[in-house]
From Swiss-Prot:
Function: Associates with the EF-Tu.GDP complex and induces the exchange of GDP to GTP. It remains bound to the aminoacyl-tRNA.EF-Tu.GTP complex up to the GTP hydrolysis stage on the ribosome.
Protein name listed in UniProt: Elongation factor Ts
Any one GO cellular component localisation term in the record: cytoplasm
SUPFAM superfamilies: Elongation factor Ts (EF-Ts), dimerisation domain, UBA-like
Keywords: Cytoplasm, Elongation factor, Protein biosynthesis
Origin species: Alkaliphilus oremlandii (strain OhILAs) (Clostridium oremlandii (strain OhILAs))
């Protein structure tokens, strides 16, 4: 079987091994990619995972407290401890924590949202559109647009970044990955607000945080 340059490139991206080692492994494996990975690992020439598939198990846990009324804990992972100590990475994690305090997302990404919740929201939005007298043939498209808006309201990576609303938190994350040169992942977060779930006088603490961020 002919070993193409694209096959060698793919194996190199998966394993981090040298080009010639990748070509030899593919030749030995008769073009079977999985077997070629095994060959390289047997020879100690392959990392377990690379690039976006690389394991990001280092990183930081950042906390932010706003006036004793809003508290956030967020975990952001990097591949190496070296990057976790990098000031740009630290600043990014801090900005993410402040953004969560200000924008109150419920999930990191849309894949984390319970499908049952999405279906329920679609059902409600469909009924709303029909009650508004919209033709059935355009209701589906309208609901799709409103579901996208729904995701942008509750998913961290899709929210406009508080310090620069022209970019999303996801855009900012992609920019940092490119600049730092390592896979970075916002893994999880928790946000607390005083009196959450208790009926009380309306106070917009999140707006206060957003104003504070804009001043920094």
């Amino acid at each position: 079987m002919d070993i193409t340059a694209s096959m060698v490139k793919e194996l190199r991206e998966k394993t981090g091994a040298g080009m010639m080692d990748c070509k030899k492994a593919l030749t030995e494996a008769e073009g079977n990619m999985d077997r070629a990975v095994e060959v390289l690992r047997e020879r100690g020439l392959a990392a377990v995972a690379k690039k976006s598939g690389r394991i990001a198990a280092e990183g930081l846990v950042e906390s932010y407290i706003h006036g004793g009324r809003i508290g956030v804990i967020v975990e952001v992972n990097s591949e190496t401890d070296f990057v976790a100590k990098n000031q740009e990475f630290k600043d990014f994690v801090k900005d993410v924590a402040l953004h969560i305090a200000a924008s109150n997302p419920q999930y990191v990404r849309r894949e984390d949202v319970d499908p049952a919740l999405v279906e329920k929201e679609k059902e409600i939005l469909t009924k709303q559109a029909l009650n508004e007298g919209k033709p059935e043939k355009i209701v589906e498209k309208m609901v799709e647009g409103r579901i996208d808006k729904f995701y942008k309201e509750i998913c961290l990576l899709e929210q406009p970044f508080v310090k620069d609303p022209d970019v999303t938190v996801g855009d900012l994350l992609t920019e940092k990955i490119s600049k730092i040169g390592e896979n970075i992942s916002i893994r999880r977060f928790t946000r607390y607000e005083v009196g959450e779930g208790i009926e009380k006088k309306e106070e917009n603490f999140a707006e206060e945080v957003a104003k504070q961020m804009a001043q920094n």
